[in-house]
Amino acid sequence: QVGYSGEKPLYYKIDIKKEIGSTTWRYMQRGYKEAVDHDAQGIILHMNTYGGTAVHADSIRTLILNSAIPVYAFIDNNAASAGALIAIACDSIYMRPGGNIGAATVVNETGAAMPDKYQSYMRATIRSTAEAHGKDTTITLSGDTVIKWLRDPLIAEAMVDTRIVVPGLDDSTKVLTLTAQEALKWGYNEAIVNNVHEIMTERLGVPEYTLQTFKPSVYDDLVGFLLNPALQAILV
C-alpha cells in the first residue's frame, strides 16, 4: 500500500504564503508529521513569501534537511529572504514564470541591515544549506572529469552579502536575487512550471496521485499567535 490513498501515491502540500514566523513553523511541524504519519511519498511547499524571523526560518530549514521524505519547493512568485533559505533546503526547487528567489540579508524590525556578525552567521547558514545538496560529477566529451556543486554555495552567499562576487552573474554592488530564468541557468531552479500538477506529472513522473493539502486548524493559528516572539526583533 502506498500512503492512505490506496493505489495512487500520496503527496502532501503545505502552503507557506505568509510571513515566516511562529505560525508558519507550527504549520510546517504539523503538516510534516501528518504527511509522515500517512506514509506520504513527498511534500510540496507551495511558497509565496517575502521573509520573516530568522529563528523560525532556520527551524524549518533544519526540518527539511533532516526530512525522512523528499521535500520540493514550488515558488509561486516569491521566495525572498527567509523564504529563500527554506527553498534552498528543499530537495528540488521549481518556479512559476516571473518568480524570484534571493535577497536574504539579515535586517531588524525597521528593515535596516544588522551588523556584520549577524550577516556572517547567515552567510554560513545559507552556504551550508546549499552545500548539503552535494556535488555532481560529469565526464566531458574530451574525457575530463568535472566536479561542481549542485547548488553553488557562492550564489547562496551572494543572496546575503553585497560584497560577494559571482563571476558572470553578480557584481559586488547589490544583494543577489534570481529570476526564474536565472535560477534555472545557475542551478537554483530545476524547471519553470505553472502549477503543482506539472511538477507531479512532468518533473516527478507521477501521472496519477493523491494530493492532500495540509489544512491548519483555528487552534494551530491560535498557538502560533501565542508563540509569536513579540520581542524577537531580528528578521531575515
Where are these regions (language model features)?
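Soluble extramembrane regions of membrane proteins in the secretory/endomembrane system
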Residues: 1-226
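Core alpha-helical transmembrane segments of integral membrane proteins
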Residues: 226-236
